[in-house]
Amino acid sequence: MYKFQKANIQKQSKQYIWLLILGGVTILASLIYLLCLDSVNKKIVTDSIYTYFHNFRKEEYDAFSLFLGSVGSNLLFTIGIWVLGISMIGIPIVFLLYMAKTFLFGFSIFGILQTFGLKGILTALIYVFPFKLLFILGMVVLTFHSLYFAFRLCSNLFRKKSYHLQQYMIRYSKLLGILLILSVIDALWEAYVLPNLLFLF
């Protein structure tokens, strides 16, 4: 029993590492994509980011609209990955959603650095920590369990293996609840706390 649990933990650790590497590669791809943009599109990106943060300093933004946009995006990825995990046919889309989220995460960071230079390091840190980073790590965990659940469903149906998924479904649902709460907290932070923090610098 102990050997089985140890082997299972080692296997899951490798899968988590694989997802982290995939996320890291996707973040690196966002940097390469940004560097490969022509001057016109680079200017569009930098102007958009500059306006976004400049409006915070001038207090020319609608906090509630910003909250709705942020929480809507977070919920789209969270619920999407969770639902696809119980659909079996959604395994490739789970990967695409995970890669899309990590790509946007990296693109935001590198876009800030490109716009503000060295001064952008502090801005990027304030933007990322703590909740956006926690949310991305939560996406790693959710993606792992989504794929795990989907593969177990496939094994039950097509390989005639018996996995007791009811108990796992309870844990999977609890994970969704945690991520939904984190999604809302991240959106609240971005809309109501982040602007005030940036205003101090």
Indicate where each model-derived feature is located:
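Cytosolic juxtamembrane amphipathic/interface segments immediately preceding
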Residues: 2-16, 158-167
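Membrane-water interface at loop-to-transmembrane-helix junctions
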Residues: 13, 58-72, 169-174
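Alpha-helical transmembrane segments of multipass membrane proteins
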Residues: 25-30, 77, 135, 178, ...
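Transmembrane helix-loop junctions in multipass membrane proteins, especially transporters and channels
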Residues: 35-46, 86-89, 116, 147, ...
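Perimembrane loop-to-helix junctions flanking transmembrane segments
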Residues: 43-65
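Pore-lining transmembrane helices
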Residues: 65-134, 141
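Terminal transmembrane helical module of multi-pass membrane proteins
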Residues: 139-201
